[in-house]
């Protein structure tokens, strides 16, 4: 084995760790969780549910969104503390309040509200910051 190859093989693990530091450091910053719950005006309509999910999906490209998940109530055991009366939820992670403000005023978000708000009868939002 040549000396340069041996040096490379010895240095490779350290290089991999060093390359991952910025990504890890970014993930350790305190972020904002924006969790939105939607109740349909017509809860029995599968068509309305699918339209709302389609609409929520359009929010994914907003640049300040770091994580994006759409969900429906899970079929967990019924307990007094569980509210599964909503139709769809949107879970997003955003870097900070400034990024959240960009998200709220972004043309994609405003278009979503304009185009799909006729589908929901109630929306509840829970915003929280990492501690």
Regions found by a protein language model. Name each.
Residues 16-22:
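Hydrophobic h-region of N-terminal signal peptides that target proteins for export
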Residues 1-16:
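N-terminal secretory signal peptides and thylakoid transit peptides that target proteins
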Residues 44-70, 107-119:
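Short amphipathic alpha-helical segments
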Residues 23-47:
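C-terminal segment of N-terminal export signals and the immediately downstream linker at the start
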């Amino acid at each position: 084995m040549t000396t340069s190859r041996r040096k490379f093989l010895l240095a490779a693990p350290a290089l991999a760790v060093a390359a991952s530091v910025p990504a890890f450091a970014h993930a350790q910053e305190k972020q904002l969780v924006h969790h939105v719950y939607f109740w349909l005006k017509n809860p029995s309509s599968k068509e309305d549910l699918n339209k709302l999910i389609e609409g929520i999906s359009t929010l994914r490209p907003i640049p300040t969104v770091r994580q994006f998940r759409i969900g429906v109530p899970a079929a967990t055991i019924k307990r007094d503390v569980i509210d599964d009366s909503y139709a769809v939820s949107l879970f997003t992670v955003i870097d900070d309040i400034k990024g959240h403000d960009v998200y709220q005023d972004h043309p994609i978000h405003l278009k979503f509200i304009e185009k799909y708000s006729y589908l929901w009868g109630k929306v509840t939002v829970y915003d929280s910051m990492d501690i």
